[in-house]
């Protein structure tokens, strides 16, 4: 993993990012237990849930955001003593860092039992499942005659959408569309297959608008009308519609075995506020609170008791919850070998370098 991260972002870039976070959080770990610092994706916790927690306990919650898993993991690899009490991370990272005793054991939390065993297993003993979903394509309905159903549509791009496509910068998701085009697993370790995927991405590069996570891109380019579709995560289209005050964005999971993501929450072992942090996670797993959160975020809840409280239209929304058959066929994000990560890092570095160098 370290080799991958060193190739992914330079040490100086990491230090700059880390220092900016420290400046934002000037109190660091000298803060009182009356506040918790949480590191998570943008737009992934309901404001009224945070307010309900503060009203109940008097403990404030400060939110800090990352926009890709690799950025967060790099920061943690360089210094586990980060000024965050709680971190949201993918299930693979949850296991990696748990092995290093970075996180608290959460098996004693009472409301942990409200989650489906499948998702509990995915996050392990030192993290709890927060949300899950699939990787797919967010697209603007007004610009498509029908939803995108093939991954090739973001690689072998139709003329009408060239220069209007967003990708993701991630060790799995960057290569995922091209690998699916090759009828390969998105987590394959085949050197030949990864090289073929690289050639496909290299050919697509002139027609890619951005490799920035779609929600980050639109927030940094609020006036843009250039984006037609983007590789994204289930639920992102609801955030896009909220941001643009429209109903134009939708989400499609192309044909093939779905690639599933799982977000887990963990408590930093070096936090001075582990008692309150664990209490906050237990609060988030209460069925009524988890239901409020899921409905706001429009993501799939791992909490089966919460799902029973959600409106029918949410539970039956196929852009959030995959049909049972497709879910059973899904590929859950899993740990890649150091050799696989290293090759992927080189490919992604080359692809993004060529993208940035284009006129």
What is the predicted function of each stretch?
Residues 93-98, 223, 228-247:
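A ligand-binding cleft/hinge motif common to bilobed small-molecule-binding domains
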Residues 28-30:
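N-terminal signal peptide c-region/cleavage motif recognized by signal peptidases
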Residues 136-143, 179-184, 261-273, 292-293:
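A bilobed periplasmic-binding-protein/Venus flytrap-type ligand-binding module shared by bacterial periplasmic
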Residues 34-96:
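Early extracytoplasmic/lumenal segment of secretory-pathway proteins
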Residues 325-359:
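Conserved C-terminal helix/tail region of periplasmic/extracytoplasmic solute-binding proteins
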Residues 268-328:
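Mature extracytoplasmic/periplasmic domains
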Residues 83, 90-209, 214-221:
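Extracytoplasmic ligand-binding site segments that recognize negatively charged/polar headgroups
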Residues 114, 133-135, 195-204, 244-269:
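Periplasmic-binding protein-like
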